[in-house]
Regions:
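Phosphate/NTP-binding elements of NTP-utilizing enzymes
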Residues: 1-151
Length: 151
């Protein structure tokens, strides 16, 4: 958790690049399609052209390492059903409606096959599901870690 313009998204975009270059499947979820498209474009600048093949219409990257990156919106979390990932990044999680239901029914099951990991990041917006996840890491629950930075 941190304020605006701190660099959370950039850090997670770098993590996305590194994980996918190791042959892993990564999902990157944003609250809106517009933000997913903007992050796709930013990631296209980070990914070496000889390593990743971008598909702008599907908002995906296929890597020569066997890894992949797929962007999704929080508006349609059911689109993740039936898929599997090593890593899921949920950016601006506080702004995704019905995130708790989406996490339990659509996102979390995608991590089961690979015993994958998820990163939730956001600018705070009240005491919603993102806040309850943040408290799990403060608790500290052994499966959760939380970080807080000022802008």
């Amino acid at each position: 958790m941190s304020g605006r313009r701190w660099g959370k998204s950039l850090i997670c975009q770098v993590i996305t690049c590194l994980e996918s270059m190791q042959g892993k499947r990564v999902a990157y979820i944003t609250p809106t399609y517009l933000l997913a498209k903007a992050f796709f474009d930013e990631l296209a600048l980070l990914m070496p052209a000889n390593v990743a093949i971008p598909n702008r219409s599907d908002l995906t990257f296929k890597l020569i390492t066997g890894g992949s990156i797929r962007f999704f919106t929080g508006e349609r979390l059911d689109n993740l059903r039936g898929l599997k990932f090593h890593y899921v990044i949920i950016d601006e999680a506080s702004f995704i409606p019905n995130l708790e239901e989406g996490w339990n029914n659509a996102i979390r099951p995608t991590l089961t096959d690979f015993q994958g990991k998820a990163i939730f990041l956001s600018t705070p917006k009240g005491k919603n599901f993102f806040y309850s996840l943040y408290l799990k890491g403060v608790d500290p629950s052994p499966e959760w870690e939380s970080f807080k930075f000022s802008s």
